Amino acid sequence: MAISFMTDIIASGGLFLAKDTKRFLFLLRNQGKTAGTWGIVGGKKEESDTTPYAALEREISEEVGKTPTIRKTIPLELFTSEDQHFYYHTYILIIDREFIPTLNNEHVGYAWCDLTHWPKPLHQGVKRSLTNKTNKTKIELLFDIIG
């Protein structure tokens, strides 16, 4: 009998929220099995990344270039797969204003949208996160806090 050793995959994603419009940044994926779906900035943690958030900072730089100052970072959720080998940290990144991202080859478009009008089709994991009742409540409370 062969023994299989699974390596844990740790990844992070960031949902930019612009305070001035209360809209979120979505990116149109260009590659792989999720090409043609709308997602958020993010990706896998690499060996050089010391934390899941450090991985997100690197992914932000790679995928959307220079961004406005992130005023606050709020953890939204930690998704764990059923087999407990995939962990996805999702953060809300609050910025003052919307910006025009400098997209790399992983994405072919972007859209700033409110949470009642998502771009379609939405990446399955992002959709699961945004339709989760607990996460929706957290986001609504966040809107109350930022005004």
Regions found by a protein language model. Give the residues of each.
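Conserved N-terminal beta-strand and adjoining loop/helix that marks the start
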Residues: 1-25
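Catalytic phosphate/metal-binding cores of nucleic-acid and nucleotide-processing enzymes, i.e., regions
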Residues: 4-5, 18, 37, 55, ...
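Active-site-adjacent beta-strand/loop module that shapes the phosphate/pyrophosphate-binding cleft
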Residues: 9-10, 20-22, 77-117, 133, ...
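Conserved Nudix-box catalytic region and its N-terminal flanking loop in Nudix hydrolases
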Residues: 22-66
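Short strand-loop junctions, especially beta-strand C-caps/beta-turns
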Residues: 43, 115-116, 121
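Active-site micro-motifs of SAM-dependent methyltransferase domains
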Residues: 62, 109, 120
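A short coil-to-beta-strand element that immediately follows conserved catalytic motifs
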Residues: 67-78
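Active-site or metal-binding loop neighborhoods of secreted/extracellular toxin and effector enzymes
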Residues: 123-143
